[in-house]
Structures are given as structure tokens and as C-alpha cells.
């Protein structure tokens, strides 16, 4: 649990005149570094136009919908790489969007293509698909089919970018 003192220290730090020249990215980075979450804004807010263009759902909306495949967006909070018993690499990525914090698995093929870009604080557009329901009908695993940096999309003319 975060103490009121810690939050007050963060607020004081953000109001300090030495931080007035900080970019939005720097402020968000310091918030996340200090608190473990974003308090003044969220990095995905900078990409609202792109998210609308691709009809991106929040993770919570996708999770609760009957739709099996969708675009979602997320900002990386942490990356933990692991190996399967067969030696294949995979990563458990903790993401944050405007609805919640969630974890997704990136398996070796997708991980190998994107490892160098998976940095805390970076935001991504993900194509996700719900796996078949398990036998007890309790949950459906959500798999990442494709992941693209939102910075990369915005540097291109995103109207012409195709995400498969």
C-alpha cells in the first residue's frame, strides 16, 4: 500500500520549479518509477488519435466481450523472460491501459522480433485473440498475435499502416 507521505512527496516533486521543464514523458517516467503506476496522466493518452483510427478496445472491454479478436493498446510496466521446458523463450509482459493492469504472454517467435523494443514505459498496439475455452468453461486465454510500437506507427502516416 502506498502511504500518503509518499504521494505527498511525489506531488511536491512534481510541483518543484526544477521539474517545470520536464517533458510529459519525464513526468510519467518519474511517477511510475516512484509509485509503480501513473497518477497525473497515462502514456496512452498521447496516442488517442491512433487508437481511434484502429478502433482499439480497452483490455477490460475486450476481455468481457464476445469478440474473439481485436486491437488493444498497452504501456509496458514490466517484462519477465522465461524458458519453457523445451528451452524456448517467452515473456510475461505486464501492461497498463486506461482500464486496468493486465499480463500477456509473448511466445518465442513474437518475442524474438520485438525483444529490443519491450521497454518499461513504451506503448504498443497489440492484435490479440481469445483462445478456445477450457473444459470447465472458466476462462479463455488471450494470446498476442502481433505487437507494434505506437511510436513507430505515429512516425509513419498511420492511415497507410496495415496491422495484420
Which residues fall in each region the model found?
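Noncatalytic, beta-rich nucleic-acid-contacting surfaces in large DNA/RNA-processing enzymes
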Residues: 1-164
